[in-house]
């Protein structure tokens, strides 16, 4: 019975997790894309290393998501187990995992363990293919304990190749994804999200961001802790530290807006909600943006109209629209909206009293200050955000599918460059590879791969891709890659020639001009 209940809950969460898949994976929808990574088994015999149990799925989930998969979140997993009275450390046997898989709405389950080997660590994992009820052979990664993140990055790459044999992103790109994260900061983060005591959680999370000030997940977790403790100014500051490139950026923006609302920073709250709404204009975001606008004495009616249209069955949106309409002189429409609110929630005593007052002979002349404030939506519906993101992804996938192979490759390469410019190398390489698959003669795709290879330290492959791009057509990025590689190898004549070619293509290129300046400084020659 317990296995069945876990399965049914995960069935629900699995559907939400689908929305995290990238639109470029539309052709692979339903093909080993929805994943559940269970905490790894601690086979070290050392309690001090128990934190790695949760570290494993944290790293794997991040790499899988960047690779186009849809891993279920830690929160979803914990929610399911908690509501069934099962411990967070729930670790099914192989037989138990197979039974669980029979009714799960996931495509793959990752189970694994880790052990020490001298001063090193060995991580091992298997993939349970749910549709086939087949467990893969074990894959393994090992390394020094100080390189723990790289060990699990390497393991993630091997597991990805099992789930998608055609996956062509280089292992070096996986390793580069976690290269800038300090292990001590990551450990503090994992301890911070795992501790039972709230003060201990905050202590670890504060230490994490102190050690690694750009570590978004730790800022997000710290913001949550401050928000739950009603420390709204501190929460707003923490949420603001989450990078726009972070997968949780929209959620951080929503809760930052709430935090700002709660301590009266209404213009900043409005801006925060507006930034989220530009990406995902969901009802709760539009409503709260309208509240922030109204609290400044401005007209939020348009936003409340959008919110009530987006979710017409939510009474609070009709309540807020009624208040706004009344404040701006539309009495009849205000009463209609308040009536609709009461149809949806008949026992809303505040709305009942307000409707009775408004219908009285002098009701519409009542002092606005005596009326209730607009209602704030205080919860972030992650499922709704995922579903909305999924709809947008599906629309984009449909648009891509309608293009010719060349047009699709151009679009994918353009999006890949956006990822690259934001430092998201794994996502960038995946889309560049997809572009090459669609059109192997697209010079920009090969040039992009050259840039990724250069960034990950694979100079031979970077040079190969850059030269391949130039055989198709001259591109600025290809000449820049070759110029940087030859300058690093002290081949200054070659570097000078290559940067000269880059400047012929784009005389205004700042990158080319800077490289020219560096070459001149090192050689003492003006080009």
List the predicted regions and their residue ranges.
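Start-of-helix register in tetratricopeptide repeats
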Residues: 186, 217, 251, 284-285, ...
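Alpha-helical segment of the N-proximal tetratricopeptide repeat
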Residues: 182-217, 221-230, 258, 262, ...
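Register position in tetratricopeptide repeats
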Residues: 197, 228-229, 262-263, 295-296, ...
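A structural "domain/chain start" motif
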Residues: 19-69, 181, 185, 213-216
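Catalytic-center loop of serine/cysteine hydrolases
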Residues: 58-62, 75-193
């Amino acid at each position: 019975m317990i296995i069945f209940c876990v399965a049914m809950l995960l069935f629900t969460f699995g559907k939400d997790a689908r929305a995290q898949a990238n639109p470029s994976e539309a052709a692979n929808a339903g093909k080993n894309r929805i994943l559940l990574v269970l905490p790894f088994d601690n086979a070290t015999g050392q309690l001090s290393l128990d934190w790695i149990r949760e570290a494993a799925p944290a790293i794997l989930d991040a790499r899988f998501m960047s690779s186009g998969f849809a891993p279920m979140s830690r929160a979803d997993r914990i929610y399911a187990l908690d509501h069934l009275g099962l411990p967070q450390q729930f670790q099914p046997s192989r037989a138990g995992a197979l039974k669980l898989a029979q009714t799960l709405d996931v495509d793959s389950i990752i189970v694994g363990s880790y052990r020490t080997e001298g001063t090193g660590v060995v991580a091992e994992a298997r993939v349970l293919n749910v549709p086939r009820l087949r467990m893969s052979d074990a894959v393994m990664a090992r390394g020094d304990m100080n390189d723990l993140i790289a060990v699990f990055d390497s393991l993630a790459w091997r597991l990805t190749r099992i789930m998608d044999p055609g996956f062509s992103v280089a292992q070096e790109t996986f390793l580069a994804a976690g290269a800038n994260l300090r292990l001590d900061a990551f450990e503090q983060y994992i301890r911070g999200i795992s501790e039972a005591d709230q003060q201990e959680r905050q202590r670890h999370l504060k230490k994490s961001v102190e050690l690694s000030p750009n570590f978004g997940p730790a800022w997000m977790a710290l913001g949550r802790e401050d928000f739950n403790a009603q420390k709204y100014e501190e929460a707003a500051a923490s949420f603001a530290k989450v990078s726009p490139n972070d997968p949780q950026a929209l959620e951080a923006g929503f809760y930052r807006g709430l935090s700002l609302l709660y301590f009266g920073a209404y213009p900043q709250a409005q801006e925060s909600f507006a930034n989220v709404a530009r990406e995902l204009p969901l009802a709760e975001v539009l409503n709260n943006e309208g509240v922030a606008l109204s609290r400044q004495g401005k007209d939020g009616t348009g936003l409340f109209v959008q919110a009530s249209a987006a979710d017409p069955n939510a009474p609070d949106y009709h309540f807020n629209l009624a208040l706004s309409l009344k404040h701006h002189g539309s009495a009849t429409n205000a009463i209609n909206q308040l009536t609709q609110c009461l149809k949806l929630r008949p026992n809303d005593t505040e709305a009942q009293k307000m409707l009775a007052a408004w219908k009285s002979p002098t009701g519409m002349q009542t002092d606005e200050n005596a009326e209730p404030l607009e209602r704030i939506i205080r919860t972030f519906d992650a499922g709704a955000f995922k579903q909305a993101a999924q709809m947008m992804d599906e629309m984009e996938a449909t648009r891509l599918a309608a293009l010719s192979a060349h047009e699709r490759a151009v679009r994918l390469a353009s999006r890949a460059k956006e990822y690259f410019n934001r430092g998201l190398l794994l996502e960038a390489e995946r889309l560049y590879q997809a572009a090459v698959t669609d059109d192997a003669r697209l010079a920009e795709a090969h040039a992009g791969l050259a840039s990724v290879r250069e960034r990950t330290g694979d100079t031979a492959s970077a040079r190969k891709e850059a030269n391949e791009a130039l055989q198709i057509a001259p591109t600025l990025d290809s000449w820049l890659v070759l110029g940087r590689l030859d300058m690093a190898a002290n081949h200054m004549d070659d570097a000078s020639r290559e940067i000269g070619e880059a400047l012929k293509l784009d005389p205004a290129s700042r990158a080319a001009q800077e490289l020219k300046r560096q070459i001149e400084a090192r050689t003492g020659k003006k080009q």
